[in-house]
Curated annotation (Swiss-Prot):
Part of the 50S ribosomal subunit. Binds directly to 23S rRNA. The L1 stalk is quite mobile in the ribosome, and is involved in E site tRNA release. Protein L1 is also a translational repressor protein, it controls the translation of the L11 operon by binding to its mRNA. GO terms for biological process: regulation of translation; translation. InterPro entries: Ribosom_uL1_bac-type, Ribosomal_uL1, Ribosomal_uL1-like, Ribosomal_uL1/biogenesis, Ribosomal_uL1_3-a/b-sand, Ribosomal_uL1_CS. The keyword Lyase does not apply. GO terms for molecular function: rRNA binding; structural constituent of ribosome; tRNA binding. It comes from Lactobacillus acidophilus (strain ATCC 700396 / NCK56 / N2 / NCFM). This is Large ribosomal subunit protein uL1. Keywords: Repressor, Ribonucleoprotein, Ribosomal protein, RNA-binding, rRNA-binding, Translation regulation, tRNA-binding. One of its GO terms (cellular component) is large ribosomal subunit. NCBIfam families: rplA_bact. It comes from the Bacteria. Belongs to the universal ribosomal protein uL1 family.
Length: 230
């Protein structure tokens, strides 16, 4: 068992580890138990009864949270011509082609999201070993490979988050900051819950959502009732 510091232990005392909290209770408690000296991120973790090894049970997508994430995302766009101009007009931080490929190959990674047109994916593909492990590779399922560059950039800037089931059949996604109101966190949680419920594979067996927990960057996990997420 890892050793926890005094701040964590003090925060953990406020959480009943045997209780499954309602969404409203959890959002109140996650704010109260954050002990960071900065505006910490609040994450939600879902554990699902899916088999990620099965192609038809891989869950992945993106959603623009109603209240954003509280974080300003730095967006890189691979595009040329009219799409490059769209990207700049929509607020992309860096727009280019071969020049960006070379820059990233040289070790530059000061960005959060990569968007590309389909025509540019042959070039972006050369960065697979760099972008892939960091979860930065553009993908049509998350709306980051598209001809509608303007919409993609605006969505990211408005607070779009990606959700993806990992090898342990879990989804980890940020839903806001400690500075958010409880209502804002509940609204963001509800929006993410709805898309995850809609994404249930037809072949998934048993209770789809096995467990749910929320936590701040520095704070204990708070378990929710997976059968009562309203």
């Amino acid at each position: 068992m890892p050793k926890h510091g005094k701040k964590y232990l003090d925060a953990a005392k406020k959480v009943d580890s045997n209780k499954l909290y309602s969404v409203a209770e959890a959002m109140k408690l996650v704010k109260e138990t954050s002990y960071a000296n900065f505006d910490a991120t609040i994450d939600v973790a879902y554990n699902l009864s899916v088999d990620p090894k099965q192609a038809d049970q891989q869950i992945r997508g993106s959603i623009v949270l109603p209240n954003g994430t509280g974080k300003t995302q730095t967006v890189v766009v691979f595009a040329e011509g009219p799409q490059a101009e769209q990207a700049k007009a929509a607020g992309a931080d860096f727009v280019g082609s071969d020049d960006l490929v070379e820059k990233i190959q040289g070790g530059w990674l000061d960005f959060d999201v990569v968007v590309a047109t389909p025509m540019m994916m042959a070039k972006v593909g050369r960065l697979g070993r760099v972008l892939g492990p960091k979860g930065l590779m553009p993908n049509p399922k998350t709306g980051t490979v598209t001809m509608d560059i303007e919409k993609a950039v605006k969505n990211v800037k408005a607070g779009q988050v990606e959700y993806r089931v990992d090898r342990q059949a879990a989804i980890h996604t940020p839903i806001g900051k400690v500075s958010f109101t409880e209502d804002q966190l509940v609204e963001n949680f509800d929006a993410l819950r709805d898309v995850i419920l809609r994404a249930r594979p037809a072949s998934a067996k048993g209770q789809y959502i096995k467990s749910v927990a929320v936590s701040a960057t520095f704070g204990p996990g708070i378990k929710l009732d997976p059968l009562n997420l309203d």
